[in-house]
């Protein structure tokens, strides 16, 4: 089971605790994040490096993304010991399985009444309910996500929006048919695009079913690099959550920057993922929070591709105790990026994930010191 409890509600968000995830005891404080995986690994890190150099505050809850593993689905099924063991993950890890990659492409126009499209290195895969159920049961993760028709951009027509919500409902009903076995705790996907009415309708249609451990909100149109409107996000989330039980875990997936994370925490989101720090690392960027975060939501992003750092032999960021900042300099990192060395991405992922982890610790501390409701 996913055992989650809210410990405190404030105007700035809610403090919670996840005691267990699946069969794994995690004692994980929220707001926090799932550790984003690609091909069953933290991008650019071996498990040995992750264990020895990536020092995070809490027990990992890993987010296993399907697109980089779907081509191995039959092999994993034949292997018979689950996806986590197949990928060499740490023993006893808490793992959540999602059909989508928060950093992957999801072009529109490819979903239909029987399946949603996911994109792999080899192209499009149409993921239907039967295939998804088989993958869920053979992968053996602690929790799973239901399918959602995500193809609801801002300019989507009313007819297509209605179809998207109806499909999301149908996918869920088919997945949990009475005579079908589905392993893993259920995290229900909530869609509806930019329509407040359809956000609420989708929540009512799929979010009030039995045996639900939590919810994940489809919000890819509001991630880093896209124009966002705080008022619009607030209204959509209010319509989504108002008809649902307030004590359930609330998740969201995608590369959200610190300012947006802080805003989403205020709207009651409990669990994010670490795709944002990975995205920055793969662009050759590192980020650092302002000294007064989260009183201020400001943060700095530094582009180490810039040749101005070539002769700079100071640490990446003063005061950061991560492996990267204590062992390497700006100039060396710029050299690694310039020569396209694999070590560059490793070092940037370590720093960015450490800073992202620190961000949530600061947010939790702020909530602890805030007046409760």
Curated annotation (Swiss-Prot):
<feature type="binding site">
    <location>
        <position position="320"/>
    </location>
    <ligand>
        <name>Zn(2+)</name>
    </ligand>
</feature>
<dbReference type="InterPro" id="IPR036511">
    <property type="entry name" value="TGT-like_sf"/>
</dbReference>
<keyword id="KW-0479">Metal-binding</keyword>
<dbReference type="GO" id="GO:0046872">
    <property type="term" value="F:metal ion binding"/>
</dbReference>
<comment type="similarity">
    <text>Belongs to the queuine tRNA-ribosyltransferase family. QTRT2 subfamily.</text>
</comment>
<feature type="binding site">
    <location>
        <position position="325"/>
    </location>
    <ligand>
        <name>Zn(2+)</name>
    </ligand>
</feature>
<protein>
    <recommendedName>
        <fullName>Queuine tRNA-ribosyltransferase accessory subunit 2</fullName>
    </recommendedName>
</protein>
<keyword id="KW-0819">tRNA processing</keyword>
<dbReference type="InterPro" id="IPR002616">
    <property type="entry name" value="tRNA_ribo_trans-like"/>
</dbReference>
<dbReference type="GO" id="GO:0005737">
    <property type="term" value="C:cytoplasm"/>
</dbReference>
<dbReference type="InterPro" id="IPR028592">
    <property type="entry name" value="QTRTD1"/>
</dbReference>
<keyword id="KW-0963">Cytoplasm</keyword>
<feature type="binding site">
    <location>
        <position position="351"/>
    </location>
    <ligand>
        <name>Zn(2+)</name>
    </ligand>
</feature>
<dbReference type="GO" id="GO:0008479">
    <property type="term" value="F:tRNA-guanosine(34) queuine transglycosylase activity"/>
</dbReference>
<keyword id="KW-0862">Zinc</keyword>
<dbReference type="Pfam" id="PF01702">
    <property type="entry name" value="TGT"/>
</dbReference>
<dbReference type="GO" id="GO:0101030">
    <property type="term" value="P:tRNA-guanine transglycosylation"/>
</dbReference>
<comment type="subunit">
    <text>Heterodimer of a catalytic subunit and an accessory subunit.</text>
</comment>
<feature type="binding site">
    <location>
        <position position="322"/>
    </location>
    <ligand>
        <name>Zn(2+)</name>
    </ligand>
</feature>
<comment type="function">
    <text>Non-catalytic subunit of the queuine tRNA-ribosyltransferase (TGT) that catalyzes the base-exchange of a guanine (G) residue with queuine (Q) at position 34 (anticodon wobble position) in tRNAs with GU(N) anticodons (tRNA-Asp, -Asn, -His and -Tyr), resulting in the hypermodified nucleoside queuosine (7-(((4,5-cis-dihydroxy-2-cyclopenten-1-yl)amino)methyl)-7-deazaguanosine).</text>
</comment>
<dbReference type="InterPro" id="IPR050852">
    <property type="entry name" value="Queuine_tRNA-ribosyltrfase"/>
</dbReference>
